[in-house]
């Protein structure tokens, strides 16, 4: 795969934002109060299940996360703390951006049209775009399980054929790209054990799997020199 052959990158939200870290930092203190505390994997599964249950009952990401906190507390048989639920609801808009993301998207924007693929529910897109140094050429916010029409509309609006876009997904279980496997895709594994830019995949033109966006930007530089 030659990443220089594409006109656009379809970046899923979790390639830019450490969503799982934000979720766990907000819910671990609650889980610790339970007689049967959940581990991180169980907390993330509970978050995803409750998000689906509440998605059509609330009108804003802040309200969704506040109610999600209260609902999880009830499931754990804990009296939900109002202030804590409000804090969790507000914190969702400030989940940490990966350290490499701002610089990487700034570099990649010089060579690609950038398309943001948002999760289906519970995300404040404006809070992310305000914290990045570049504007996205298009934003796809899936409204249901089949978000192909929204993607097709976004690509048409920026005059990029579907074959000209390279999807870039995270390793999260509910990454939006996981439901579309009918064309080549890049995966960011975010392997913190290896330094950025030194993984073999950054230097291997036959694969598209990187440890970070910085890794991918470095691979692009190598491809230009090849």
Task: List where the protein language model places each region.
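Asp-based, Mg2+/Mn2+-dependent phosphohydrolase catalytic module
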Residues: 1-7, 11, 106, 117-226
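A generic structural signal for well-ordered alpha-helical segments
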Residues: 31, 73, 108-109, 178
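Helix C-cap/helix->beta junction micro-motif
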Residues: 34, 76, 110-112, 181
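Catalytic-core regions built around general acid/base machinery
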Residues: 100-111
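Amphipathic alpha-helical segments that form well-ordered structural scaffolds
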Residues: 67-71, 104, 153
């Amino acid at each position: 795969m030659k990443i220089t052959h594409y006109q656009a990158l379809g970046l899923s939200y979790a390639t830019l934002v450490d969503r799982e870290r934000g979720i766990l930092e907000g819910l671990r203190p609650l889980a610790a109060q339970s007689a049967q505390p959940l581990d991180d994997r169980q907390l993330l599964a509970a978050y995803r299940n409750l998000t689906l249950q509440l998605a059509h009952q609330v009108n804003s990401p802040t309200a969704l996360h506040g109610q999600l906190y209260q609902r999880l507390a009830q499931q754990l048989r804990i009296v939900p703390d109002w202030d804590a639920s409000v804090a969790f609801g507000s914190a969702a808009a400030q989940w940490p951006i990966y350290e490499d993301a701002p610089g990487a998207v700034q570099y990649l924007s010089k060579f690609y049209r950038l398309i943001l693929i948002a999760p289906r529910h519970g995300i404040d897109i404006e809070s992310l775009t305000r914290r990045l140094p570049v504007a996205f050429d298009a934003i796809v916010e899936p409204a249901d399980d089949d978000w192909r029409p929204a993607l097709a509309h976004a690509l048409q609006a920026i005059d990029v054929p579907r074959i000209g876009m390279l999807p870039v997904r995270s390793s999260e279980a509910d990454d939006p790209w996981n439901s579309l496997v009918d064309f080549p895709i890049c995966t960011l594994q975010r392997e913190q054990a290896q330094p950025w830019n030194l993984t073999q995949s950054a230097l291997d033109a036959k694969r598209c799997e990187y440890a970070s966006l910085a890794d991918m930007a470095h691979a692009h530089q190598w491809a230009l020199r090849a």
